[in-house]
Regions:
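Beta-sheet repeat architectures centered on beta-propellers
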Residues: 1-138
Length: 138
């Protein structure tokens, strides 16, 4: 670090690759006896994946459907038309980032990666999908 940084705000850190792979997503229900049970059998098609985060600089969402190429969606903290952050400033955002999945739940691998030394504070994930069954449950 060069120069006098008295009173300056800055981050010090070591760059390392962060990787988180989500487990397979299933619909669940509460059976009469209590607890939670996976609804198996019907087709669940994941449509979108949304990451919610707090004071985060950047990360990537990687979607790999079985038999297809991996799609990487980078989040950089900058949004088109944003007037709060100028070029050259550190962009730490509290927001959400939605990407397309378009794959069946059992055939989609969803990963979050980051190699930035800046903060990456992931809070939760949400998915939206289509559920189709051809039979009635008794």
């Amino acid at each position: 670090v060069r120069g006098n940084l008295t009173g300056a705000k800055f981050f010090v850190g070591e760059s390392y690759p962060m990787l988180y792979e989500f487990s397979t997503q299933y619909l669940k229900e509460q059976p009469p006896g209590g607890g939670m049970a996976v609804i198996s059998g019907p087709k669940l098609q994941l449509r979108t994946w949304t990451m919610l985060f707090d004071k985060t600089s950047s990360f990537n969402i990687k979607i790999t459907p079985r038999g297809r190429d991996t799609m990487t969606y980078p989040y950089t903290g900058f949004e088109v038309g944003d007037q709060e952050i100028s070029l050259g400033e550190l962009a730490l955002r509290t927001s959400k980032f939605r990407v397309p999945v378009m794959a069946q739940n059992i055939e989609a691998k969803i990963e979050i990666t980051s190699s930035s030394p800046l903060p990456c504070r992931l809070q939760s994930a949400e998915w939206e999908g289509f559920y189709h069954t051809r039979a009635a449950r008794l």
